């Protein structure tokens, strides 16, 4: 009996671990948008969120932005599971959100890239510290582009999804939401 209880306590503990591995609760990110507003990653709880690390000077990032825009456009009005312990729930929330974290040094370059690439979502932050970014340190970023897909509870469910791979994972969760609605 003691062994079973210890095992269950260990499972419970792992379910609330904050970290950057799949299954962990994603670390909080707080920052200032290009327009000066304060935002937090936790404000997006209840939605599927892609935390996307990029920079204006990163060619692969800029290329991937085109794919990301298509994904956002495709999934913006779809129902996804929502809420605490979302697996198996029928409650849904519309849309898919992107929380962009830039490793730029120049505010003007960062803002210009957002405009040029048409990254029209409101969730953009940068501490303008390049590779010395506190955000990069928290998420252990060593190269970009890099991203983390979070479920509605803020848990990391996938990492480094690009293009069709991201679309396929989102489609899987959207399909799950629609199945649950029919039950």
Label each PLM-derived region with a short phrase.
Residues 47-49, 96, 145:
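Alpha/beta-hydrolase fold active-site loops
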Residues 45-46, 53-74, 79:
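Conserved redox-active cysteine motifs that mediate thiol-disulfide chemistry
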Residues 50-54, 100-102:
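Structural cue for short, hydrophobic secondary-structure segments
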Residues 29-49, 81-89:
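A short beta-strand-turn-helix
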Residues 143-144, 149-183:
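Thiol-/selenol-based redox modules, centered on thioredoxin-like
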Residues 2-10:
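Hydrophobic h-region of N-terminal signal peptides that target proteins for export
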Residues 99, 104-148, 152:
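Short, internal strand/loop/helix patches
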Residues 11-42, 175-176:
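N-terminal "domain-start" segment that seeds a small globular fold
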């Amino acid at each position: 009996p003691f062994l079973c209880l210890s095992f269950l306590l260990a499972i419970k503990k792992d379910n609330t671990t904050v970290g950057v591995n799949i299954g962990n609760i994603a670390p909080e990110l707080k920052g200032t948008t290009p327009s000066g507003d304060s935002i937090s990653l936790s404000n997006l709880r209840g939605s599927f969120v892609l935390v996307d690390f990029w920079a204006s000077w990163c060619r692969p990032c800029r290329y991937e932005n085109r794919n990301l825009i298509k994904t956002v456009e495709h999934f913006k009005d779809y129902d996804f599971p929502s809420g605490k312990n979302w697996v198996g729930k029928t409650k849904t929330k519309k849309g898919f959100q992107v929380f962009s974290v830039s490793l730029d040094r120049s505010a003007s370059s960062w803002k210009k890239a957002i405009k040029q690439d048409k990254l029209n979502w409101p969730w953009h932050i940068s501490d303008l510290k390049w590779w010395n970014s506190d955000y990069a340190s928290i998420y252990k970023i060593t190269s970009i582009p890099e991203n983390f897909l979070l479920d509605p509870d803020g848990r990391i469910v996938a990492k480094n999804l690009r293009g069709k791979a991201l679309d396929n994972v989102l489609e899987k969760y959207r399909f799950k939401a629609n199945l649950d609605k029919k039950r």
